[in-house]
Amino acid sequence: LVIYAELLFLYLQLQFPYTESQYKKIKVAFLIHNWILLILCFTSGSYMDSRFWLKSATSGADPNYLSGWFVIPLCFAVELLFSEKIKKVWKILITAQVVLSFYFIMQTASKSGLITNACVLAIATIYTFRSMIKEHPGRALTVLVIFALGVFIAVNNMPAYLVQRLSNGDTTGTGRFPMWVTLAETMLNNPIKMIFGFGTSAVKYYTGTGLVSHNTYLDLLFNEGLVGFIPLVIYIAKSIRIKIKKCPYTVIAFLGMSVLLLTLSAFNTRFFMLLLFLIGMDVTEDLE
């Protein structure tokens, strides 16, 4: 019932259209939120097991979840960074925001978090380059050189533990793949429950470890069944088809987030719900 309640609440939120100017304010709000998050990282961060954590009473402070909060702001940051309507002083601040965000993302030593945010940044930049190369080839070349230099510096200054995790695999011992196999076999052996679901939060009782599966899509399919999984997939597919031209950066953020969701149980997280809202919201032209 949880998924239906959340989807109903999401549906009610999406009954109100938003103008382009209001949508722009939402983007700015995400950038402001990101600066607040960066301030919290500086003031309330700590290291445990060679990974950066944010001191908090919620699970959102977990390194993997923390990296997820940077996805949406990074995508909007790239969009505004290359906009000709934005003043240079704001572009400098946005550049600093992107650099600091990746610094803390790397400090979390989250493989999926780093890959997700790097993909979002790269795809958003490449998408922007399509028009920039035609209109301002010199500027595009300069940005490309700066981007390549930034990647080189970042790669050569990665935390040692992150390099170890990237090269040697996950050393946390969660054993994601065996859990996925166990859950898949359980569903195949119980076709009725596969259709209607095993029940909210049931997944951790079937993994054999007492842990969630660390896969949002698998969690959803197992807990809520096909009757809960299919409506969400339809909602996402229809929203992306509509938004791909009108709000491309939101779609890029969602596609990038999908990488993180493959290794993280994040259906009930605020950043995922916000992203579902962003890809579903109706954006209309401003009235003259």
Predicted regions mapped to residue ranges:
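Membrane-interface micro-motifs in multi-pass membrane enzymes
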Residues: 1, 57-73, 213-216, 221-225, ...
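A membrane-periplasm/extracellular boundary helix in multi-pass inner-membrane enzymes
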Residues: 108, 125-168, 184-189
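Alpha-helical transmembrane segments of multi-pass inner-membrane proteins
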Residues: 7, 22-49, 61-128, 234
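Structural signal for the C-terminal ends of transmembrane alpha-helices
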Residues: 11-21, 77-85, 122-132, 154-157, ...
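Aromatic-anchored segments of alpha-helical transmembrane domains
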Residues: 35-40, 99-103, 148-153, 255-265
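Membrane-anchoring hydrophobic segments
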Residues: 1-40, 168-169, 281-288
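Hydrophobic transmembrane alpha-helices and their immediate junctions
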Residues: 88, 130, 136-137, 223-258, ...
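Long extracytoplasmic/lumenal interhelical loops at the membrane interface
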Residues: 53, 57-59, 161, 167-224
